[in-house]
Amino acid sequence: MPSPHSLQTLAKKILATQQISTDHYFILKYCGLWWHGAPIMLSTNEDNQLMIKSASFKEGLSLDLALMKVVQENNHDLIKLFTEWGADINSSFVTVNMECTRNLCRELGAKEALNERDILQIFYKTRDIKTSSHVILCHELLSNNPLFQNIERMRSIIYRSLEKLSINFILDDISFSEMLTRHWYGLAILYNLTEAIQYFYEKYKHFKNWRLICGLSFNNLSDLYEIYNLEKVDMNIDEMMYLACSIYDGNYSTIYYCFVLGADINQAMLTSVINHCIGNLFLCIDLGADAFEDSMELAKQKNDNIFISILSFKNYSPDSSLLSLKMTDPEKINALLDEEKYESKNMLMFDAHDEKTSTSPVRL
């Protein structure tokens, strides 16, 4: 038979999922479902993970991150509640700052101390949630947290994630706190979290061109368009195209946008070969790139048989329907060049040729 304590926890959980009239907010206050002057609400995200919402975190936080915040605030009632709802009590040690709160967390089952593996696991879990509230709070709680500063494996993970993006600063010359800040800022752009993007943009204007670099690299054309037209950009269009072509295979919208602005499409073709970006290569050919000899030389230098096969085909031609558009509207470009839907005319031609002539077709 369930204990009265577990029934009370369940009742609060059910109550937090309901739409409650402001006339009945006193019930939520009485039940302890109140945080930062507003009701606590529970919901699930697209991955069926429980999310905590309140006035300060309208888009939602993971249970673990919400626990870290109430531990920082030394809010013992909510520490107990969020733990009862399933938050990992060990994550409390990331933000604990008073001995009485540390003792409570131990009473609730926390370890005596966290090892490197525990800390890494906490960090990995924080990166799964794609809301502005979550990404901003991750930055505020973790970027300058001493617990994360001396974990060599974490430093290596963040370093590698930023390595290709560090085109206008020396990665070895910045602090790990700045690396983490750039990491969260980049995630906001990757997931197109507009509130978080504005937060980082206003707070870290000295991160020169970082928003532009991430928009290009992560195919966020809407944000790229906004920042490119918002301020003077001191990066030439071919540098922008290099980022669009080299970081991720499928950056069709940002490649097209840079092309319309005047970037060298042949150089983009070479960059796509160097970085083994097949989809990007075919889009460059669709847009009129014809640097086939130089591209073949690069493919041979890399012993890249897939690209050698692709570049050996001789019947490619520009896609006149694509070239005739010359548009810069982000919504229209994204609709036309959606990564999941766009079919390159030249890729289709190569696939048909390859299936006819090869006993082992190239898998694209």
From Swiss-Prot:
Q: Which InterPro entries match?
A: ASFV_MGF360 (IPR002595)
One GO process term, biological-process aspect: taxis
**A Pfam family it matches:** ASFV_360
Q: What does this protein do?
A: Plays a role in virus cell tropism, and may be required for efficient virus replication in macrophages.
The record's similarity note reads: Belongs to the asfivirus MGF 360 family.
Name listed for the protein in its UniProt record: Protein MGF 360-18R
Provenance organism: African swine fever virus (isolate Tick/South Africa/Pretoriuskop Pr4/1996)
